[in-house]
A protein has these predicted regions:
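Active-site beta3 strand of CheY-like receiver
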Residues: 43-53
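Receiver (REC) domain active-site loop signature in two-component systems and cognate sites
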Residues: 58
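C-terminal output helix
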Residues: 114-124
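Alpha4 helix (beta4-alpha4-beta5 surface) of REC/receiver domains from two-component response regulators
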Residues: 80-82, 92-108, 121
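Two-component/phosphorelay signaling modules centered on CheY-like receiver
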Residues: 10-31, 104
Length: 131
């Protein structure tokens, strides 16, 4: 399985990679624009991402906007199943959570700092990790 980490903070990228590296082939990008490019490339190479972990607050293109673009691509290309996308953010704000799920159609949401336990719990819910 393949995972894409979309995170602008170095330490967060390093921690998330350490949590996922035994479960997934992991790629890392630093903003939403690169996330959309990596997503497209994965499908063009017939090697799509099973999981995308995406920060919300990032430079250039934020996580919610990037997720909307990814979902639009999935619809245009009739890609099924859709990628599982877990949004990560330091903002524990109900409005941001709702926007992630309803505007971006996120699969899950984790408030930072992300722990191994919270990430694995989300992966279990999304059936990407067995108990």
């Amino acid at each position: 399985m393949r995972a894409l980490i979309v995170e602008d903070e170095f330490l967060s990228r390093k921690v998330l990679r350490s949590f996922l590296m035994t479960l997934f082939e992991v790629d890392i990008v630093v903003n939403g624009r690169e996330a959309v490019e990596a997503f497209k490339l994965g499908h063009e190479e017939n090697s799509p991402y099973d999981l995308i972990l995406m920060d919300i607050m990032m430079p250039e293109v934020d996580g919610i906007e990037a997720l909307k673009k990814i979902r639009e691509l999935e619809d245009q290309l009739t890609l099924r199943p859709r990628a599982k996308v877990i949004m990560t953010t330091a903002l524990d704000d109900p409005q941001t959570v709702l926007k992630s799920f309803y505007d971006g159609e996120a699969s899950g949401y984790i408030v930072k700092p992300v722990s191994r336990e919270s990430l694995y719990k989300e992966l279990e819910k999304l059936e990407l990790l067995k108990k």
